[in-house]
């Protein structure tokens, strides 16, 4: 019963907010350079870069890795 309620809640959340936070892979030299520099500045290893469209605003998301795992970081100087 609880599992069914949880699945329904997750489905509703993805239905309403599904397009928010979708990150499209970006492998252009600009994306790579900005994210690589951003990860190095944070003392982390660069993994990849993607672009997120939230409410018609494009935002770059850098995926950096350290010993705790891979996490997203958002550079301000795009």
From Swiss-Prot:
Its main location: secreted. One of its GO terms (cellular component) is extracellular region. It comes from the Eukaryota. It is found in: Secreted. The keyword rRNA-binding does not apply. Keywords: Disulfide bond, Secreted, Signal. Expressed by the venom gland. Residues 1-23 form the signal peptide. Contains 4 disulfide bonds. This is Toxin-like protein 10. It comes from Urodacus yaschenkoi (Inland robust scorpion).
């Amino acid at each position: 019963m609880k599992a069914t309620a949880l699945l329904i809640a997750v489905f509703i959340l993805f239905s309403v907010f599904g397009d928010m936070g979708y990150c499209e892979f970006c492998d252009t030299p600009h994306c790579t350079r900005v994210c690589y520099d951003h990860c190095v500045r944070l003392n982390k290893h660069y993994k990849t870069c993607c672009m997120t469209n939230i409410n018609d605003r494009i935002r770059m998301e850098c995926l950096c890795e350290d010993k705790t795992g891979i996490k997203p970081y958002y550079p301000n100087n795009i």
